[in-house]
Amino acid sequence: MMSQEFAHLSVLLTETVAGLNIKEDGIYIDGTFGRGGHSREVLKHLGENGRLIAIDRDPQAIAAAEQFADDARFSIVHGGFGQLATYVEDLGLKGKIDGVLLDFGVSSPQLDDAERGFSFLRDGPLDMRMDNSQGETAADWIARAEIEDMAWVFKTYGEEKNSRHIARCIAADREKTPFLRTKELADLIARISKNKERNKHPATRVFQAIRIYINSELEQIDQALEGALSVLAPHGRLSVISFHSLEDRMVKRFIRRHCQGESVPHGLPITEAEINKSRLLKGIGKAIKPSEEEVERNTRARSSVLRIAERLEY
Protein backbone atom coordinates (compact mmCIF):
# COMPACT_ATOMS: atom_id res chain seq x y z
CA MET A 1 0.00 0.00 0.00
CA MET A 2 1.34 3.46 -0.89
CA SER A 3 2.11 5.81 1.98
CA GLN A 4 -0.10 8.91 2.26
CA GLU A 5 3.03 11.06 2.07
CA PHE A 6 3.75 9.92 -1.48
CA ALA A 7 0.15 9.42 -2.70
CA HIS A 8 -0.55 10.16 -6.35
CA LEU A 9 -3.65 11.63 -8.00
CA SER A 10 -4.02 10.55 -11.61
CA VAL A 11 -4.62 13.55 -13.88
CA LEU A 12 -7.68 13.75 -16.18
CA LEU A 13 -8.61 10.26 -15.00
CA THR A 14 -12.22 10.07 -16.17
CA GLU A 15 -11.59 11.86 -19.47
CA THR A 16 -8.55 9.76 -20.37
CA VAL A 17 -10.21 6.41 -19.74
CA ALA A 18 -13.43 7.55 -21.47
CA GLY A 19 -11.29 8.44 -24.48
CA LEU A 20 -10.25 4.79 -24.79
CA ASN A 21 -13.88 3.81 -25.47
CA ILE A 22 -13.25 0.56 -23.61
CA LYS A 23 -14.71 -2.75 -24.76
CA GLU A 24 -15.28 -5.30 -21.99
CA ASP A 25 -13.23 -7.98 -23.75
CA GLY A 26 -10.61 -5.63 -25.21
CA ILE A 27 -6.84 -5.57 -24.79
CA TYR A 28 -5.35 -2.32 -23.48
CA ILE A 29 -1.93 -0.88 -22.75
CA ASP A 30 -1.13 1.52 -19.90
CA GLY A 31 2.30 2.62 -21.09
CA THR A 32 2.99 4.73 -18.00
CA PHE A 33 1.75 2.76 -14.98
CA GLY A 34 3.09 5.14 -12.31
CA ARG A 35 1.16 4.23 -9.19
CA GLY A 36 -1.72 2.55 -10.99
CA GLY A 37 -4.47 5.17 -10.96
CA HIS A 38 -5.30 4.94 -14.65
CA SER A 39 -4.84 1.15 -14.66
CA ARG A 40 -7.29 0.78 -11.79
CA GLU A 41 -9.91 2.78 -13.69
CA VAL A 42 -9.37 0.79 -16.91
CA LEU A 43 -9.81 -2.49 -15.01
CA LYS A 44 -13.16 -1.25 -13.67
CA HIS A 45 -14.43 -1.10 -17.26
CA LEU A 46 -13.05 -4.47 -18.39
CA GLY A 47 -14.97 -7.74 -18.21
CA GLU A 48 -13.43 -11.02 -17.08
CA ASN A 49 -12.06 -11.66 -20.59
CA GLY A 50 -10.48 -8.23 -20.92
CA ARG A 51 -6.76 -7.66 -20.56
CA LEU A 52 -4.54 -4.80 -19.41
CA ILE A 53 -0.77 -4.71 -19.96
CA ALA A 54 1.07 -2.01 -18.02
CA ILE A 55 4.61 -0.71 -18.61
CA ASP A 56 6.95 1.31 -16.39
CA ARG A 57 10.71 1.66 -15.99
CA ASP A 58 10.57 2.88 -12.38
CA PRO A 59 11.32 -0.03 -9.99
CA GLN A 60 9.04 1.59 -7.39
CA ALA A 61 6.17 1.54 -9.89
CA ILE A 62 6.78 -2.16 -10.49
CA ALA A 63 6.55 -2.71 -6.73
CA ALA A 64 3.32 -0.68 -6.61
CA ALA A 65 1.82 -3.00 -9.24
CA GLU A 66 1.64 -5.72 -6.57
CA GLN A 67 -1.76 -4.23 -5.70
CA PHE A 68 -3.10 -5.97 -8.83
CA ALA A 69 -1.24 -9.27 -8.32
CA ASP A 70 -4.48 -11.22 -7.81
CA ASP A 71 -6.15 -9.84 -10.95
CA ALA A 72 -5.60 -12.29 -13.82
CA ARG A 73 -6.49 -9.59 -16.35
CA PHE A 74 -3.45 -7.51 -15.38
CA SER A 75 0.25 -7.87 -16.15
CA ILE A 76 3.17 -5.44 -16.06
CA VAL A 77 6.46 -5.09 -17.94
CA HIS A 78 9.52 -3.44 -16.39
CA GLY A 79 10.83 -1.18 -19.14
CA GLY A 80 10.46 2.14 -20.94
CA PHE A 81 7.32 3.04 -22.86
CA GLY A 82 9.51 3.75 -25.88
CA GLN A 83 9.82 -0.03 -26.31
CA LEU A 84 6.05 -0.50 -26.22
CA ALA A 85 5.85 -1.99 -29.72
CA THR A 86 8.57 -4.53 -28.95
CA TYR A 87 6.80 -5.76 -25.81
CA VAL A 88 3.50 -6.09 -27.68
CA GLU A 89 5.11 -7.94 -30.59
CA ASP A 90 6.81 -10.33 -28.15
CA LEU A 91 3.35 -11.17 -26.80
CA GLY A 92 2.04 -11.81 -30.32
CA LEU A 93 -0.49 -8.98 -30.02
CA LYS A 94 0.57 -6.56 -32.75
CA GLY A 95 -2.53 -5.13 -34.44
CA LYS A 96 -4.79 -6.49 -31.67
CA ILE A 97 -4.54 -3.68 -29.11
CA ASP A 98 -7.82 -1.83 -28.55
CA GLY A 99 -6.34 1.15 -26.75
CA VAL A 100 -3.09 2.71 -25.55
CA LEU A 101 -2.89 5.16 -22.66
CA LEU A 102 0.21 7.33 -22.19
CA ASP A 103 0.71 9.84 -19.36
CA PHE A 104 4.01 11.67 -19.77
CA GLY A 105 4.02 13.38 -16.36
CA VAL A 106 6.40 12.65 -13.51
CA SER A 107 4.34 11.02 -10.76
CA SER A 108 3.81 12.76 -7.44
CA PRO A 109 5.68 10.03 -5.51
CA GLN A 110 8.71 10.62 -7.74
CA LEU A 111 8.54 14.39 -7.22
CA ASP A 112 7.79 14.24 -3.51
CA ASP A 113 10.42 11.65 -2.61
CA ALA A 114 13.54 13.78 -2.09
CA GLU A 115 15.77 10.74 -2.58
CA ARG A 116 14.74 10.52 -6.25
CA GLY A 117 16.32 13.91 -6.94
CA PHE A 118 13.58 15.35 -9.18
CA SER A 119 12.48 18.22 -6.97
CA PHE A 120 14.07 21.65 -6.54
CA LEU A 121 11.84 22.19 -3.48
CA ARG A 122 13.08 19.16 -1.50
CA ASP A 123 16.77 18.58 -0.89
CA GLY A 124 18.05 15.21 -2.02
CA PRO A 125 20.75 13.56 -4.13
CA LEU A 126 20.94 15.06 -7.62
CA ASP A 127 19.73 11.92 -9.42
CA MET A 128 16.63 12.40 -11.66
CA ARG A 129 16.75 8.93 -13.26
CA MET A 130 13.35 7.35 -13.91
CA ASP A 131 15.02 3.96 -13.47
CA ASN A 132 17.46 4.61 -10.65
CA SER A 133 19.03 1.19 -11.05
CA GLN A 134 20.90 2.17 -14.21
CA GLY A 135 22.23 5.07 -16.26
CA GLU A 136 23.95 8.38 -15.59
CA THR A 137 22.72 10.60 -12.76
CA ALA A 138 22.09 14.33 -13.13
CA ALA A 139 25.07 14.96 -10.83
CA ASP A 140 27.35 12.87 -13.06
CA TRP A 141 26.21 14.72 -16.18
CA ILE A 142 26.59 18.18 -14.63
CA ALA A 143 30.10 17.25 -13.49
CA ARG A 144 31.29 16.39 -17.01
CA ALA A 145 29.14 18.44 -19.42
CA GLU A 146 30.71 21.23 -21.46
CA ILE A 147 29.22 24.72 -21.10
CA GLU A 148 27.89 24.61 -24.67
CA ASP A 149 26.24 21.24 -24.06
CA MET A 150 24.56 22.41 -20.86
CA ALA A 151 23.34 25.61 -22.53
CA TRP A 152 21.90 23.58 -25.41
CA VAL A 153 20.07 21.19 -23.07
CA PHE A 154 18.64 24.03 -20.96
CA LYS A 155 17.42 25.92 -24.02
CA THR A 156 16.19 22.94 -26.04
CA TYR A 157 14.47 20.93 -23.32
CA GLY A 158 13.65 23.67 -20.81
CA GLU A 159 13.07 26.62 -23.15
CA GLU A 160 15.30 28.55 -20.74
CA LYS A 161 16.12 32.05 -22.07
CA ASN A 162 19.21 32.44 -19.86
CA SER A 163 20.64 29.03 -20.71
CA ARG A 164 24.18 30.18 -21.51
CA HIS A 165 24.46 32.38 -18.40
CA ILE A 166 23.25 29.56 -16.15
CA ALA A 167 25.59 27.04 -17.80
CA ARG A 168 28.60 29.32 -17.29
CA CYS A 169 27.73 29.86 -13.62
CA ILE A 170 27.31 26.11 -13.04
CA ALA A 171 30.68 25.43 -14.69
CA ALA A 172 32.39 28.08 -12.55
CA ASP A 173 30.87 26.81 -9.30
CA ARG A 174 31.59 23.13 -9.94
CA GLU A 175 35.30 23.93 -10.11
CA LYS A 176 35.13 24.73 -6.39
CA THR A 177 32.56 22.15 -5.26
CA PRO A 178 30.74 19.49 -7.29
CA PHE A 179 26.94 19.65 -7.40
CA LEU A 180 25.69 16.59 -5.54
CA ARG A 181 22.40 17.82 -4.04
CA THR A 182 19.25 19.25 -5.61
CA LYS A 183 19.24 22.22 -3.23
CA GLU A 184 22.78 23.19 -4.22
CA LEU A 185 21.80 23.48 -7.87
CA ALA A 186 18.40 25.10 -7.19
CA ASP A 187 19.93 27.70 -4.86
CA LEU A 188 22.58 28.65 -7.42
CA ILE A 189 19.99 29.13 -10.16
CA ALA A 190 17.75 31.17 -7.86
CA ARG A 191 20.70 33.37 -6.92
CA ILE A 192 21.86 34.12 -10.47
CA SER A 193 18.47 34.19 -12.20
CA LYS A 194 17.92 37.36 -14.23
CA ASN A 195 14.25 37.06 -15.18
CA LYS A 196 12.06 35.67 -12.42
CA GLU A 197 8.68 34.33 -13.61
CA ARG A 198 5.63 34.87 -11.45
CA ASN A 199 4.54 31.75 -9.54
CA LYS A 200 7.44 29.74 -10.98
CA HIS A 201 10.67 28.79 -9.21
CA PRO A 202 13.73 30.01 -11.16
CA ALA A 203 15.06 26.43 -11.34
CA THR A 204 11.89 24.96 -12.89
CA ARG A 205 13.03 25.06 -16.51
CA VAL A 206 16.58 23.84 -15.83
CA PHE A 207 15.41 20.90 -13.70
CA GLN A 208 12.88 19.97 -16.39
CA ALA A 209 15.57 20.14 -19.06
CA ILE A 210 18.04 17.97 -17.15
CA ARG A 211 15.35 15.39 -16.35
CA ILE A 212 14.25 15.18 -19.99
CA TYR A 213 17.84 14.84 -21.18
CA ILE A 214 18.96 12.30 -18.56
CA ASN A 215 15.99 10.05 -19.32
CA SER A 216 15.88 10.61 -23.12
CA GLU A 217 12.23 11.48 -22.61
CA LEU A 218 11.46 13.09 -25.97
CA GLU A 219 13.06 10.20 -27.84
CA GLN A 220 11.02 7.80 -25.70
CA ILE A 221 7.84 9.77 -26.47
CA ASP A 222 8.49 9.69 -30.21
CA GLN A 223 9.11 5.93 -30.09
CA ALA A 224 6.03 5.38 -27.91
CA LEU A 225 3.71 7.26 -30.26
CA GLU A 226 4.99 5.44 -33.34
CA GLY A 227 4.89 2.16 -31.43
CA ALA A 228 1.31 2.71 -30.29
CA LEU A 229 0.21 3.41 -33.86
CA SER A 230 1.87 0.20 -35.06
CA VAL A 231 0.14 -2.06 -32.51
CA LEU A 232 -3.39 -0.63 -32.47
CA ALA A 233 -6.25 -2.61 -33.97
CA PRO A 234 -8.62 -0.83 -36.39
CA HIS A 235 -10.72 1.63 -34.33
CA GLY A 236 -8.28 1.26 -31.43
CA ARG A 237 -7.89 4.43 -29.37
CA LEU A 238 -4.86 6.44 -28.27
CA SER A 239 -5.21 8.66 -25.16
CA VAL A 240 -2.16 10.82 -24.43
CA ILE A 241 -1.56 13.25 -21.56
CA SER A 242 1.29 15.75 -21.82
CA PHE A 243 2.47 18.31 -19.29
CA HIS A 244 4.58 20.90 -21.08
CA SER A 245 4.68 22.53 -24.49
CA LEU A 246 7.50 20.35 -25.87
CA GLU A 247 5.53 17.17 -25.22
CA ASP A 248 2.20 18.57 -26.37
CA ARG A 249 3.66 19.87 -29.63
CA MET A 250 5.06 16.41 -30.35
CA VAL A 251 1.69 14.74 -29.70
CA LYS A 252 -0.27 17.35 -31.66
CA ARG A 253 2.03 17.12 -34.68
CA PHE A 254 2.05 13.31 -34.57
CA ILE A 255 -1.75 13.10 -34.62
CA ARG A 256 -2.06 15.80 -37.28
CA ARG A 257 0.54 14.12 -39.52
CA HIS A 258 -1.22 10.78 -39.43
CA CYS A 259 -4.65 12.36 -39.85
CA GLN A 260 -3.55 14.17 -43.01
CA GLY A 261 -1.61 11.28 -44.53
CA GLU A 262 1.30 11.54 -46.90
CA SER A 263 1.86 14.70 -48.91
CA VAL A 264 1.36 14.01 -52.63
CA PRO A 265 2.87 16.29 -55.32
CA HIS A 266 0.27 18.13 -57.42
CA GLY A 267 -0.56 16.37 -60.67
CA LEU A 268 0.62 12.92 -59.59
CA PRO A 269 -1.72 10.24 -61.03
CA ILE A 270 -3.04 8.83 -57.76
CA THR A 271 -6.59 8.13 -56.59
CA GLU A 272 -8.32 9.50 -53.50
CA ALA A 273 -8.54 5.94 -52.17
CA GLU A 274 -4.77 5.55 -52.41
CA ILE A 275 -4.26 8.85 -50.60
CA ASN A 276 -6.66 7.78 -47.86
CA LYS A 277 -4.62 4.63 -47.21
CA SER A 278 -1.86 6.81 -45.79
CA ARG A 279 -4.26 8.40 -43.31
CA LEU A 280 -3.83 6.23 -40.25
CA LEU A 281 -5.57 8.24 -37.52
CA LYS A 282 -8.54 10.47 -36.93
CA GLY A 283 -8.61 12.96 -34.08
CA ILE A 284 -11.35 12.54 -31.48
CA GLY A 285 -12.61 15.91 -30.27
CA LYS A 286 -10.45 18.82 -29.21
CA ALA A 287 -7.61 18.89 -26.71
CA ILE A 288 -8.96 18.48 -23.18
CA LYS A 289 -7.68 20.41 -20.16
CA PRO A 290 -8.50 19.81 -16.50
CA SER A 291 -11.48 21.53 -14.91
CA GLU A 292 -11.05 24.25 -12.30
CA GLU A 293 -12.27 21.75 -9.71
CA GLU A 294 -9.56 19.25 -10.63
CA VAL A 295 -6.84 21.90 -10.50
CA GLU A 296 -8.09 22.93 -7.04
CA ARG A 297 -7.78 19.30 -5.90
CA ASN A 298 -4.44 18.75 -7.61
CA THR A 299 -2.39 21.80 -8.64
CA ARG A 300 -0.02 19.57 -10.64
CA ALA A 301 -2.85 18.98 -13.11
CA ARG A 302 -2.79 22.64 -14.18
CA SER A 303 -0.54 22.26 -17.23
CA SER A 304 -1.88 18.88 -18.41
CA VAL A 305 -3.41 18.40 -21.87
CA LEU A 306 -5.20 15.28 -23.13
CA ARG A 307 -5.37 14.42 -26.83
CA ILE A 308 -7.29 11.44 -28.22
CA ALA A 309 -7.08 9.74 -31.61
CA GLU A 310 -8.51 6.61 -33.25
CA ARG A 311 -6.78 4.13 -35.56
CA LEU A 312 -8.42 3.95 -38.96
CA GLU A 313 -9.01 0.75 -40.95
CA TYR A 314 -5.89 -0.70 -42.54
Curated annotation (Swiss-Prot):
InterPro entries from the UniProt entry: RsmH (IPR002903), SAM-dep_MeTrfase_MraW_recog (IPR023397), SAM-dependent_MTases_sf (IPR029063)
SUPFAM superfamilies (UniProt xref): Putative methyltransferase TM0872, insert domain, S-adenosyl-L-methionine-dependent methyltransferases
EC category name: transferase
Binding site for S-adenosyl-L-methionine: G36, G37, H38, D56, F81, D103, Q110
Record field: catalytic activity: cytidine(1402) in 16S rRNA + S-adenosyl-L-methionine = N(4)-methylcytidine(1402) in 16S rRNA + S-adenosyl-L-homocysteine + H(+)
Record keywords: Cytoplasm, Methyltransferase, rRNA processing, S-adenosyl-L-methionine, Transferase
Location in the cell: Cytoplasm
GO cellular component, one term: cytoplasm
Cross-referenced NCBIfam families: 16S rRNA (cytosine(1402)-N(4))-methyltransferase RsmH (TIGR00006)
Family to which this protein belongs: Belongs to the methyltransferase superfamily. RsmH family.
The protein's name: Ribosomal RNA small subunit methyltransferase H
Species for this entry: Shewanella sediminis (strain HAW-EB3)
